[in-house]
Amino acid sequence: MVDPARARKLAKRIGTIVATAIDHEIKDPRLAFVTITDTKVTNDLHDATVYYTVMGEKVDSAPDVEAAAAGLEKAKGVLRSKVGAGTGVRFTPTLTFVADTVPDTARHMEELLARAKAADDEVAKARENAQPAGDADPYKEPRVASDEDEASPDVREAD
């Protein structure tokens, strides 16, 4: 076991090395739109999991996650050697690439929030012209007792 702070530092360094290598040294066109989002290292520093996202070639085009996964799998050996040279640890961790689902989850949450806002707007629009079911003012003020009310003919005091 190793210090968790050291594992976090190594994970951050591995993510930086892999991202730089993908951008500048690996010429695979399948990796052109790959972004490294996170890296986790096991406590024994033997395995590293690299999370990535793939953006579409255009804004409205779907990303090709399968091609990016195949490109990363093919470049795994080169990337591991770059990590070994860049980190200086005794044992170079094995790299595992996992497609990150955070952007998809965030997009789904944004869609749910947009639907909830539309439903709230619809309720607010219906509320604008609504009339109460009973009296217009359900909180009527209580009657104030006056002198005339006290001397009503129904209730007379005996003299």
From Swiss-Prot:
InterPro entries: KH_dom-like_a/b, RbfA, RbfA_dom_sf, Ribosome-bd_factorA_CS
A GO biological process held by the record: maturation of SSU-rRNA
Signal peptide per UniProt: none
TM segment ranges: none
Biased composition (Basic and acidic residues): 118-128, 137-146
Any GO MF annotation of the entry: ribosomal small subunit binding
Subunit structure: Monomer. Binds 30S ribosomal subunits, but not 50S ribosomal subunits or 70S ribosomes.
PANTHER family xrefs: RIBOSOME-BINDING FACTOR A, CHLOROPLASTIC-RELATED (PTHR33515:SF1)
Name of protein: Ribosome-binding factor A
Native source organism of the sequence: Rhodococcus erythropolis (strain PR4 / NBRC 100887)
Gene that specifies this protein: rbfA
